[in-house]
């Protein structure tokens, strides 16, 4: 009996160590998500600037300013990144939109006074940053192209294009990038451990299964309150950070599970 208890304690420690490895990985990914997004946006804005600079250098002595701008707009028209969500826009330092591949109606109009639901003026902010330090990050709220029911936070970057006194901007909804990071994290965790012996499952704050070997979508889909549901609810509604529970597997063997919150 003592030997059995020692075996149980050893397995509890092994399970805890495995989950803590996953826990640390998730926390590190979450902590670095914003920095990764900034790096991505900086790379893309530099790419757009390089394209425009190359066109300018090639045609500055051959074509008019208006003709060169049209070539720049054509070059950037279909450039997309971040799974098709990312694009570029161009404004004058006075706040006139020069180029917008999605909202063509903005082109040629003064958008300096456009503000979000919190009263922030993104174009004004972008211009101020470009004037002060040529490039930098800023944020504001806007609605998605296919969902205008709510405005979500966007992280943007601006870079000055000095030859024409323009600014180039691009941005990403933070929620979309966080979801991308979340999906990458789940894919990584899928490959950890033995799927038959020590499967890892992930549940979000709304009790949805993000990773599971069953067809369950939500904890509420479990018809009767078994030991798992009971333990999950107890941990969720407590100030504890983790919890063990034991149960009898379908194979009639004793199983140990370990739950840990990710804040």
Tell me what each language-model feature is:
Residues 1-66, 70, 74-86, 155, ...:
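Juxtamembrane extracytoplasmic/periplasmic/luminal helical "stalk" adjacent to the first N-terminal
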Residues 93, 163, 205:
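Short, ordered coil/turn segments that flank beta-strands lining enzyme active or ligand-binding pockets
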Residues 86, 123, 148-159, 242-244, ...:
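A short beta-strand signature within small-molecule sensing/ligand-binding domains used
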Residues 152-184, 256-263:
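Conserved beta-strands of PAS-like sensory domains
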Residues 87-90, 96-101, 106-107, 113:
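Mid-length scaffold segments of soluble, non-membrane domains
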Residues 31-32, 93, 216:
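Surface-exposed, polar/charged faces of alpha-helical domains
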Residues 62-75, 104-145, 182-187, 214-252:
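Extracytoplasmic/periplasmic sensor domains and loops in membrane signaling proteins
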Residues 88, 96-98, 200, 207-213:
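Conserved hydrophobic beta-strand signature of PAS-family and PAS-like sensory domains
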């Amino acid at each position: 009996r003592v030997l059995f208890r020692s075996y149980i304690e050893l397995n509890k420690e092994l399970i805890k160590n495995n989950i803590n490895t996953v826990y640390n990985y998730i926390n590190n990914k979450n902590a670095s998500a914003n920095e990764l997004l900034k790096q991505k946006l900086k790379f893309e804005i530099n790419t757009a600037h390089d394209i425009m600079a190359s066109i300018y250098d090639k045609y500055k002595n051959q074509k008019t300013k208006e003709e060169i701008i049209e070539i720049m707009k054509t070059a950037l028209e279909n450039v997309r990144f971040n799974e098709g969500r990312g694009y570029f826009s161009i404004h004058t330092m006075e706040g006139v939109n020069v180029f917008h591949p999605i909202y063509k109606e903005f082109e040629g109009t003064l958008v300096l006074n456009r503000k979000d639901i919190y009263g922030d003026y993104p174009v004004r902010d972008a211009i101020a940053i470009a004037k002060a330090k040529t490039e930098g990050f800023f944020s504001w709220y806007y609605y998605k192209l296919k969902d205008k029911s709510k405005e979500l936070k966007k992280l943007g970057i601006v870079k000055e294009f000095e030859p024409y006194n323009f600014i180039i901007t691009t941005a990403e909804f933070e929620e979309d990038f966080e979801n991308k990071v979340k999906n990458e994290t789940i894919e990584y965790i899928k490959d950890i451990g033995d799927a038959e012996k020590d499967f890892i499952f992930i549940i979000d704050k709304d009790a949805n299964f993000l990773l599971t070997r069953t067809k369950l979508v939500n904890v509420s889909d479990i018809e009767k309150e078994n030991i798992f549901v009971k333990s999950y609810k107890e941990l969720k509604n407590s100030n504890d950070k983790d919890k063990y529970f034991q149960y009898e597997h379908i194979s009639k063997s004793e199983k140990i599970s370990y739950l840990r919150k990710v804040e």
